[in-house]
Amino acid sequence: GDTKPSDQKKPTPTEVRTSTWDRYTNARIQKLHPKIRQMVINFINDAQDRGYKLRVTSGLRTFEEQQALYSKGRTTGGRKVTNARPGTSFHNYGLAIDVVEIGPQKGMDGFKKGYDKSRWDDIGKLGKEHGFFWGGDFRSLSDKPHFEFNDEKKLKIRGPNGLLEKYR
């Protein structure tokens, strides 16, 4: 017989999506620690559903890349962008991401003139809902694009040298 449109199967709201809208983000997610890959996918997709088109700009980072960032504003020019030395950043273990909102100007990062700062608060709140610790809550150097795996804050897994021993 005849099937009415209401009889057709509708996708369930609990359907798990395995990728995001953005191929650059998807490639970076694959390099993250397996423990947070789906969390990041869910966060990015939920943000998009709420009108925030986010791209992961940084995920897993080598100690050398971390040293280059740590040097900014210290031994090289520019402003300080991190307080994390190599080995002490959650990025070094694939447990953190930095995001940018892709807007009409292709890459407004919340630091540019004219950006609605309240959007970062909304994005930060959303990240926390997905189980991340938000860099916007850092006490010393606010890092609104930064999100890291929250459970590690509770587990106190840093060794005496500050490294995240569990993920070395």
What do the PLM-derived regions correspond to, one by one?
Residues 2, 52, 74, 131-135:
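Short aromatic/hydrophobic-glycine micro-motifs
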Residues 16-58:
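Active-site acidic/histidine clusters and adjacent loop/turn architecture
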Residues 38-41, 45, 67, 121, ...:
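Solvent-exposed, polar/charged alpha-helical surfaces in well-ordered, non-transmembrane soluble domains
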Residues 55-71:
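Acidic helix-start/capping segments at beta-turn-to-alpha-helix junctions
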Residues 63-66, 75, 104-106:
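Short, charged/polar surface micro-motifs in flexible loops or helix N-caps
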Residues 73-85:
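Cytochrome P450 catalytic domain signature, combining two hallmark sequence patches
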Residues 84-168:
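Catalytic cores and adjacent binding grooves of peptidoglycan-active enzymes
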